[in-house]
């Protein structure tokens, strides 16, 4: 097991990474205010891992209540969130009860938002079970649900008490989900860690083959990058915005195509290629670097072209992005592999041409 730390002063918390951490109640118990938890999971992850987590906690004297949500991005909404509140109220959970998210990014985002708002805040623990949630969404305290007009538009910053990333849960992860998670790993290499990008170019097939050492390295290196950024800029006033490389385009894809039709990582991959193309057109990124970025995404089994939505639809959806400031669209772009910038000066016609060049 490897432990990293998210340095947020008196709200600092550890990230425990390794096989079997799910079964170790001793990693959870110190962070409980009382001997009571409520677990939020879904109908895919629950049958695989709920009994193990519940058994470990109950053996340690902890009372466990559970709510199982329907799986998928299409359910990340008020209606599903209310199922969590229904359980918390029906079982008389208190402000001191700890909410545990057992699942991928959708479960973590919704459980975290429930924890942030139930009785104005209850303790929260992340147990991510997908590659994407282990390397990205479980760390940093972003919680949200979707709105028909935009992804993650209703939410809060709310940090977990501890993150348990059990790498053995990736053994049951579908190949498509594994590949989608790699989009976020590649992102860290592109925005701030060129050595990670080089490593991925050399070892991407090992990660796809789920070699334990390669997976562990990719997860640990990604979490270390995320932890550093979050510690420096918790509420996304500066550097943390760079973690959104590809996300402005990607969220437009997810919203425009209907939540769940494109996985988040797939949309981020296509969005990253749009950002790379725009960076090239602005004279920042060389054609050779764009080709390297595309080649790595292709080897990872990720899309490098977005869906053929009208450019006007992309731009309309992107106008709802959370990084828009005073009506100006701010995009995360690349000066080089390993150096990202937040840029608000790109002309709409150049943005549109970049989108058009990267639509299938």
UniProtKB/Swiss-Prot annotation:
The record's subcellular location field reads: Cytoplasm
Give an example GO biological process. amino acid biosynthetic process
Entry superkingdom = Bacteria
Query: Entry's InterPro entries?
Result: Dehydroquinate_synthase, DHQ_synth_AroB, DHQ_synth_fam, DHQS/DOIS_N, DHQS_C
EC identifiers of the protein = 4.2.3.4
The transmembrane segments are none
Functional summary from the UniProt entry: Catalyzes the conversion of 3-deoxy-D-arabino-heptulosonate 7-phosphate (DAHP) to dehydroquinate (DHQ).
Family to which the UniProt record says this protein belongs: Belongs to the sugar phosphate cyclases superfamily. Dehydroquinate synthase family.
- Name under which the protein is recorded: 3-dehydroquinate synthase
Organism name? Aromatoleum aromaticum (strain DSM 19018 / LMG 30748 / EbN1) (Azoarcus sp. (strain EbN1))
What is the name of the gene encoding this protein? aroB
């Amino acid at each position: 097991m490897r432990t990293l730390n998210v340095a947020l002063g008196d709200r600092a918390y550890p990230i425990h990474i390794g096989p079997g951490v799910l079964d170790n109640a001793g990693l959870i118990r110190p962070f409980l205010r009382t001997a009571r938890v409520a677990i939020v999971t879904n109908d895919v992850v629950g049958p695989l891992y709920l009994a193990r987590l519940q058994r470990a906690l109950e053996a340690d004297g902890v009372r466990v209540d559970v709510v199982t949500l329907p799986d998928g991005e299409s359910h990340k909404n008020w209606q599903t969130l209310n199922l969590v509140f229904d359980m918390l109220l029906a079982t008389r959970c208190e402000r001191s009860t700890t909410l545990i998210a057992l699942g991928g990014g959708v479960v973590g985002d919704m459980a975290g938002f429930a924890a942030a708002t139930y009785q104005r805040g209850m303790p929260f623990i992340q147990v991510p079970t997908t590659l994407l949630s282990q390397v990205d969404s479980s760390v940093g305290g972003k919680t949200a649900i979707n709105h028909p007009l935009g992804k993650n538009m209703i939410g809060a910053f709310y940090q977990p008490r501890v993150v348990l990333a059990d790498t053995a849960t990736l053994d049951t992860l579908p190949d498509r989900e594994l590949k989608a998670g790699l989009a976020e790993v590649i992102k860290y290499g592109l925005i701030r860690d060129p050595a990670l990008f080089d490593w991925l170019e050399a070892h991407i097939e090992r990660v796809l083959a789920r070699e334990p050492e390669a997976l562990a390295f990719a997860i640990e290196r990604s979490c270390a990058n995320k932890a550093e950024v979050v510690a420096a800029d918790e509420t996304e006033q500066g550097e943390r915005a760079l973690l959104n490389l590809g996300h402005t385009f990607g969220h437009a894809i997810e919203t425009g195509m209907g939540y769940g039709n494109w996985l988040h990582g797939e949309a981020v991959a296509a969005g990253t290629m749009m950002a790379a193309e725009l960076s090239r057109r602005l004279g920042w990124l060389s054609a050779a670097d764009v080709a390297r970025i595309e080649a790595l995404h292709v080897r990872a089994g990720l899309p490098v072209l977005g869906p053929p939505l009208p450019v006007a639809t992309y731009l309309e959806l992107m106008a709802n992005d959370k990084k828009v400031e005073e009506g100006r669209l701010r995009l995360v772009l690349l000066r080089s592999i390993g150096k990202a910038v937040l840029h608000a000066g790109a002309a709409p016609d150049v943005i549109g041409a970049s989108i058009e060049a990267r639509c299938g």
